[in-house]
Structures are given as C-alpha cells and as structure tokens.
C-alpha cells in the first residue's frame, strides 16, 4: 500500500486516506464479520424437525447449511440420538420454543397426518431446498417441500409437503399434488399431472 508525503494511502490513482484510516476501517470490517458470525438469531428461527430417520438427517444437514435457523432439533418416536428432544406427540409442547417446524417423514400418509397438525398448531412451515439442487427460478414450491442435493426441478409446481429426492427430476410444466414423493432417480415428465400422495419410485418415469 503506497502513501504520499502527507501519509495518505494510495487507492488506484487517488491518495484518499491515511494509513491509520485504512487500518481502522479494515479492523472495523473484520469486527463486523466476526459479530455477524456470532450474533444470536431470534427464537422465531428455531426449527423443529419431525422425524429423525434417514430423510430427517438429510433435511437437518440441508437446513444447517442454509445458516438461517438458530437451533435445529428433532422429535421422533423410535430413534435415540443427538438433538432428539422428545416424541412426535410432544409437538404442541414445543410450539413456543420452535415456531418453525418441518415434517421429514418419507411415508406420504404419515407425513400428511403431521402436516395437518402443523397447520392446526399454527407452526411456520418452511421449505428446505438444498443449494446443491438445480431448481428453476420459475418453479412454484409449496410449504414444507424438501428438495435434496442433485435433484432437478424445472418450471414446475410442487404441492405442499412434497419430497424430491437426490437425482430426482421434475420437468417443466409438471404439476405435483400435495405430499408426493419423487424418489432417487425418478423422473416426472414435462406437463405431467401427479395426484396427491403419489410415490414416484426410484427409476420410474411418470407422465
């Protein structure tokens, strides 16, 4: 960093700041970055995931990578492990601590059952979309939708609580109903109409 006789730092062709001013601004910027990393997020960004199985863990990793949620915990009836704070029947008990909730259960009927409870209890219901998925900016994505890494979604419509698994493909102009599941490697063709609760199995081509 060059300076002139007055001690002003050279920025391109202009001597605009003293060395001390440059250092002070740099230190202030570094302090702000550190503060942003450690700043507590409000309680409304706590997320409760219903289901701690394989799909639940996938959703957890995506949600964590988004750096949106302050705290992420699970409810599960059969799995014991880290971050599991209670059973699925405890859902209402945690409403005040975890305003956001997501149903991460692969079974379409069971997922729909808990989805109805989230509505009844007035949870905020985010969609969880992996940054590693290829999703059109024109896609219409409902509440509680999970789109996993390497999935591809065109200019399509995904109903509430639908899952598009890794390497699943939903082509443009397709319309999926609520609580559908496009499994790994499954393809929903262009302009297909998919009924609520449909499971498109791995390797299947629908439409």
Q: Where are the regions that the model predicts?
A:
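Short, surface-exposed polybasic/aromatic micro-patch for ligand or macromolecular engagement
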Residues: 1-39
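Short alpha-helical
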Residues: 21, 54-57, 109-110, 140, ...
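Short, solvent-exposed amphipathic alpha-helical segments in soluble enzyme
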Residues: 30, 63-67, 118-120
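Hydrophobic, well-ordered beta-alpha structural blocks that scaffold small-molecule cofactor pockets
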Residues: 41-83, 87, 92-94
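A general structural motif
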Residues: 44, 69-71, 98, 122, ...
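Short amphipathic alpha-helical segments
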Residues: 60-62, 113-117, 159
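Phosphate-bearing ligand-interacting subdomains
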Residues: 79-134
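Left-handed beta-helix
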Residues: 131, 136-137, 142-143, 147-149, ...
């Amino acid at each position: 960093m060059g300076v002139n006789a007055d001690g002003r730092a050279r920025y391109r062709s202009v001597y605009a700041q003293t060395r001390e001013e440059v250092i002070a601004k740099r230190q202030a910027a570094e302090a702000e970055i550190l503060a942003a990393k450690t700043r507590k997020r409000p309680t409304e960004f706590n997320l409760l995931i219903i289901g701690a199985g394989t799909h639940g863990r996938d959703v957890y990793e995506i949600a964590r990578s988004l750096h949106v949620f302050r705290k992420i915990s699970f409810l599960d009836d059969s799995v014991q492990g880290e971050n599991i704070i209670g059973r699925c029947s405890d859902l209402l008990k945690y409403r005040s601590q975890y305003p956001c909730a997501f149903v991460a259960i692969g079974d379409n009927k069971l997922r729909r059952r808990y989805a109805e409870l989230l509505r009844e209890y007035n949870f905020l219901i985010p969609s969880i979309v992996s940054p590693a998925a290829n999703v059109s900016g024109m896609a219409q994505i409902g509440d509680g939708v999970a789109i996993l890494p390497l999935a591809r979604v065109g200019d399509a419509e995904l109903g509430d609580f639908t899952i598009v698994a890794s390497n699943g493909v939903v082509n443009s102009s397709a319309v999926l109903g609520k609580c559908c599941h496009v499994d790994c490697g499954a393809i929903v063709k262009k302009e297909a109409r998919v009924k609520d609760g449909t499971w498109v199995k791995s390797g299947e081509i629908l439409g």
